Regions:
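Short aromatic-cysteine micro-motif
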Residues: 1-86, 190
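C-terminal, surface-exposed recognition/capping segments
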Residues: 30-33, 60-64, 68-103, 108-192
Length: 192
């Protein structure tokens, strides 16, 4: 998942003019938190809970074609320009990890640059990082709040399409296994 996200920085995906000024990586836990807080702000839905994407085929925006236009409640902003699938659909792994343990991911965690991963030294929300939308928001909107540990060292975010505790502030603990129920989100950013 991490290595796949890094591929977006290759010339296959970007123009020759822009490739030196971009960074692609798998979304970090704190980056998920930033989007979650934006949803909670006046620029997003505010205190209105985001609608769960309950599409069992995991389609972005809750369906095919133009369904994203009618399912704007699934967007962080309440309109089509927001970020979709932050609640429900499939769990989305982020680069949030307990104690540099690989679990079932197959990733050499120690080889991941520090700017691309959030490492947690504890197994409760007391070990959260300020801004990652775990400790400070645990349980908001009745979203899942299960912290990483030695058996399940990876954070997935958002929750399942069929789960009542799915939501933008939902987080869980999993081993890093590949599954059709677990996806990931890539980030492409501009370097200064």
């Amino acid at each position: 998942m991490y290595n796949t996200s890094k591929l977006f920085n290759s010339t296959t995906y970007l123009t020759n003019d822009g490739i030196q000024n971009t960074d692609s990586h798998m979304m970090k836990n704190i980056e998920w938190g930033a989007v979650a807080y934006l949803k909670q702000s006046i620029y997003g839905l505010g205190i209105t809970d985001i609608t769960i994407n309950n599409n069992s085929s995991y389609y972005t925006g809750g369906g095919t074609g133009t369904s994203y236009k009618t399912n704007i409640g699934q967007s962080t902003s309440g309109n089509i320009t927001g970020v979709y699938d932050m609640s429900g659909g499939a769990w989305e792994y982020v680069m949030g990890n307990y104690n540099k343990q690989a679990g079932d991911s197959g990733l050499t965690v120690s080889g991941v640059p520090a700017e691309h991963i959030d490492i947690y030294s504890g197994t409760s929300v007391a070990a959260s990082h300020l801004g990652d939308a775990t400790g400070e928001t645990a349980g908001w909107y009745s979203d899942s709040a299960i912290f990483v540990n030695s058996s399940n060292p990876w954070f997935p975010r958002g929750g399942y399409f069929f789960s009542n505790d799915a939501g933008v502030f939902s987080f869980g603990d999993y081993a890093g296994e590949v599954s059709d129920h677990f996806w990931f989100r890539s980030v492409l950013s501009v370097k200064e």
